[in-house]
């Protein structure tokens, strides 16, 4: 029998490690009294919302200013003394203690990267101390829903050095009967797409998230290529595999207009452009179709398309219950993107997912463009029964690590495993 004292935090250490872009990030290890260890590494974004929690960087000559030794030192000098002696099972107390110690509204004192690393490592240590997988520890005995992956196979915008305005063009294999099958379907289309690009003399180099980053004539050309790849791989667009977009429109929002494709569009015109895309392609989900503070534009987008497709708020919500509640009150979007480092603690992440579910919004668990081998978000997707995950393409090990963890979870669950696409709990195709 496990003694509760065995699960008390004994030691916390931190170090500066590298993410998938070669930039420093924070790793934390939490050691419990009985010897269980939890380790976590935080990710970092490229296109970041203005309202995200503060990522603390050193700003000196090391790593061109991107070092994180300040955050590492905060963990070992300030956070560790405050948390040692607290039960790892009391996640809310652990996270609350760090927030109180920080004292700011956006975690700018200690750094959200410092707080989150310890928060996630604590949960991992508690799970290990109890002998449970992380998804079971966080989600309880009913955690058995495997998410539909939104696979970013063509990268643009801030994620690639090409001429595509929109940031992500994704495959959504909702027609699969299992997560394993969805992964196979996505991989087959991914490799078929590579062949199509090569045949046209286009680049098959990949961007930050493992998708291809070719120079194409326009955003429509990307959609056309994906339809061709889906069909050539033997699948039916809209039935087996649909499309999703991350427009990341904040990135090209200038002086009240959306500047892309050689034109400038008002919010109303931008909504009309997105509606045309939904009419033309089997798109079932659009993320950040409008900019992070264009609340009126978002309301119009939701009124026009909210009953037809999933409208995900990323930059506008930043995994914040306060901003999500504002969106709920104003009928903005119908889904929230969940990025643990946007809000900076596991407790607040779970609160955002809970609020979304109670309000009829879907949640999409997401990686960042600067990722690591950490697989926490895979377990989080299953634990929270979110039904959807965004973790990149079918290449680059930091992306595939999450897919492989979901395969392990599906195997471990056996007959209990349920694929969200097979039950209609993920995004679904349009007839």
Swiss-Prot record:
Q: Which residues form a coiled coil?
A: none
Report the domain of life of the source organism: Bacteria
Q: What is its main location?
A: cytoplasm
The positions annotated for binding Mg(2+) are 246, 287, 314
The EC category is: lyase
Establish whether keyword Signal is in the entry. Answer: no
Please provide the Gene Ontology terms (biological process) for this protein: glycolytic process
Q: Name one GO molecular function term.
A: magnesium ion binding
Fetch the Gene3D superfamilies from UniProt. Answer: Enolase-like C-terminal domain, Enolase-like, N-terminal domain
Could you name the active-site residues?
209, 339
Q: What are the names of the required cofactors?
A: Mg(2+)
**Which EC number(s) does UniProt give?**
4.2.1.11
Report the co-factor binding details.
Binds a second Mg(2+) ion via substrate during catalysis.
Q: In which pathway does it act?
A: Carbohydrate degradation; glycolysis; pyruvate from D-glyceraldehyde 3-phosphate: step 4/5
What job does the chain carry out? Answer: Catalyzes the reversible conversion of 2-phosphoglycerate (2-PG) into phosphoenolpyruvate (PEP). It is essential for the degradation of carbohydrates via glycolysis.
Protein family: Belongs to the enolase family.
| Listed name of the protein | Enolase
Which source organism?
Prochlorococcus marinus (strain MIT 9313)
């Amino acid at each position: 029998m496990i003694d509760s004292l065995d699960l008390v935090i004994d030691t916390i250490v931190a170090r500066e490690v590298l993410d998938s872009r070669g930039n420093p990030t924070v790793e934390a290890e939490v050691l419990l009294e009985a010897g269980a260890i939890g380790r976590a590494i935080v990710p970092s974004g490229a296109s970041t919302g203005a309202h995200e929690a503060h990522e603390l960087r050193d700003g000196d000559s090391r790593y061109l200013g991107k070092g994180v030794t300040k955050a590492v030192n905060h963990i070992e000098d300030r956070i560790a003394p405050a948390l040692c002696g607290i039960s790892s099972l009391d996640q809310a107390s652990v996270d609350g203690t760090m927030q109180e110690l920080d004292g700011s509204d956006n975690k700018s004192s200690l750094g959200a990267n410092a707080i989150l690393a310890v928060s996630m490592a604590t949960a991992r240590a508690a799970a290990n101390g109890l002998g449970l997988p992380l998804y079971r520890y966080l989600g309880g005995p009913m955690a058995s829903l495997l998410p539909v992956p939104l696979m970013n196979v063509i990268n643009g915008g801030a994620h690639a050095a090409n001429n595509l305005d929109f940031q992500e063009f994704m495959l959504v294999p909702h027609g699969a009967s299992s997560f394993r099958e969805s992964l196979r379907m996505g991989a087959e289309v991914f490799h078929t797409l590579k062949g199509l690009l090569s045949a046209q003399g286009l680049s098959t180099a990949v961007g930050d998230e493992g998708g291809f980053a070719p120079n194409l004539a326009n955003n429509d050309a990307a959609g056309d290529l994906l339809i061709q790849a889906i069909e050539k791989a033997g699948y039916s667009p809209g039935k087996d595999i649909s499309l999703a977009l991350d427009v990341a429109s904040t990135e090209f929002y200038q002086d009240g207009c959306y500047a892309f494709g050689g034109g400038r569009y008002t919010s109303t015109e931008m909504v009309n452009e997105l509606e045309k895309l939904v009419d033309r392609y089997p798109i079932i989900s659009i993320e950040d179709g409008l900019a992070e503070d264009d609340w009126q534009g978002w309301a119009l987008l939701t009124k026009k398309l909210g009953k037809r497709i999933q409208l995900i708020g990323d930059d506008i919500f930043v995994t914040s219950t306060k901003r999500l509640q504002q969106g709920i009150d104003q009928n903005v979007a119908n889904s929230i993107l969940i990025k643990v480092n946007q809000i900076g603690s596991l407790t607040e992440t779970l609160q955002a997912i809970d609020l979304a579910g109670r309000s009829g919004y879907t949640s999409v668990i997401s990686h960042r463009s600067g990722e690591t081998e950490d697989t926490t978000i895979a377990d989080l997707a299953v634990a929270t029964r979110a039904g959807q995950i965004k973790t990149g393409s079918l290449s680059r090990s930091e992306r595939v690590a999450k897919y492989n963890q979901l395969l392990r979870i599906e195997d471990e669950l056996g007959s209990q495993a349920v694929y969200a696409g097979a039950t209609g709990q993920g995004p679904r195709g349009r007839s």
